[in-house]
């Protein structure tokens, strides 16, 4: 509808894994998009469920079900033809977003965050 305006998406790394092939699709179709990835190396929304499955405690078995090997999504984006920007400190984010918005091509902002920073449960 408005190809000159970028679509901005925020996702976690676990969710991004489900749709990572769409970066190549966006490059091929020249879709002006910016994807901000909260890259903490795990599917933190799943943590509590896996803990419950293992008796309510964080065990090595439970942890291996929701954590991932380290990934540089910015480098992966570049390999697919998109703009990849890695952000490792909060002060880098504003510049990264400005650069991505001006790119006029698919851009992935890979924001490295702390896996131990788990949001409070929305429901109990």
Regions found by a protein language model. Name each.
Residues 1-124:
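Thiamine diphosphate
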């Amino acid at each position: 509808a408005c190809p000159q305006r970028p679509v901005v998406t925020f996702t976690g790394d676990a969710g991004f894994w489900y749709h990572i092939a769409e970066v190549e699709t966006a490059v091929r179709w020249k879709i002006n998009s910016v994807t901000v990835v909260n890259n903490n190396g795990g599917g933190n929304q799943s943590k509590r469920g896996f803990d419950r499955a293992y008796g309510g405690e964080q065990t090595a078995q439970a942890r291996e079900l929701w954590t991932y090997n380290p990934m540089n999504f910015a480098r992966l984006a570049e390999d697919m033809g998109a703009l990849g920007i890695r952000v490792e400190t909060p002060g880098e984010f504003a510049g990264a977003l400005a650069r991505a918005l001006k790119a006029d091509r698919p851009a992935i902002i890979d924001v490295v965050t702390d896996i131990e920073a788990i949001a409070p449960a929305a429901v109990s």
